[in-house]
UniProtKB/Swiss-Prot annotation:
This is Putative protein adenylyltransferase MJ1217. It is an enzyme of class 2 (transferase). Binds 2 Mg(2+) ions. Probably forms a complex with cognate toxin MJ1216. It comes from Methanocaldococcus jannaschii (strain ATCC 43067 / DSM 2661 / JAL-1 / JCM 10045 / NBRC 100440). Its EC number is 2.7.7.108. PANTHER family: PROTEIN ADENYLYLTRANSFERASE MJ0128-RELATED, SSL8005 PROTEIN. Probable antitoxin component of a putative type VII toxin-antitoxin (TA) system. Neutralizes cognate toxic MJ1216 by di-AMPylation. The lineage of its organism: Archaea, Methanobacteriati, Methanobacteriota, Methanomada group, Methanococci. It catalyses: L-tyrosyl-[protein] + ATP = O-(5'-adenylyl)-L-tyrosyl-[protein] + diphosphate; O-(5'-adenylyl)-L-tyrosyl-[protein] + ATP = O-[5'-(adenylyl-(5'->3')-adenylyl)]-L-tyrosyl-[protein] + diphosphate. Mg(2+) 1 binds at residues 43, 45, 75.
């Protein structure tokens, strides 16, 4: 099981690729990994914002890329997809930007 520090380092090293290939403007970790309460079975929750909208297929490709890169299942959401104010507040409380 990777630590939060290891995950942050991997994501930092790949920021350029994420920006160029997937148009990622910002990337942040939230949820159990951000709170350092993860278990062996935990996935990693990642929030992205992008420079220009990407297609659903590209979003799925990015989620798979990140899962392979980190060796952990990634649950990826976009900043613009959070419409419920309570969910948004809960996510914002955990966010760790890379």
């Amino acid at each position: 099981m990777k630590t939060l520090s290891e995950i942050k380092e991997i994501l930092r090293k790949h920021k350029k690729i994420l920006k160029e290939k997937y148009k990622v403007k910002s990337i942040a970790i939230f949820g159990s990994y951000a709170r350092e309460e993860q278990k062996e079975t935990s996935d990693i929750d990642i929030l992205i914002d992008y420079y220009e909208p990407i297609s659903l297929l590209k979003l799925i490709e990015l989620e798979n890329y990140l899962s392979d890169l980190l060796g952990i299942k990634v649950d990826l959401i976009t900043k613009n997809s959070i419409h419920n104010p309570y969910v948004k507040k809960s996510i914002e409380e955990d966010l760790i930007y890379i």
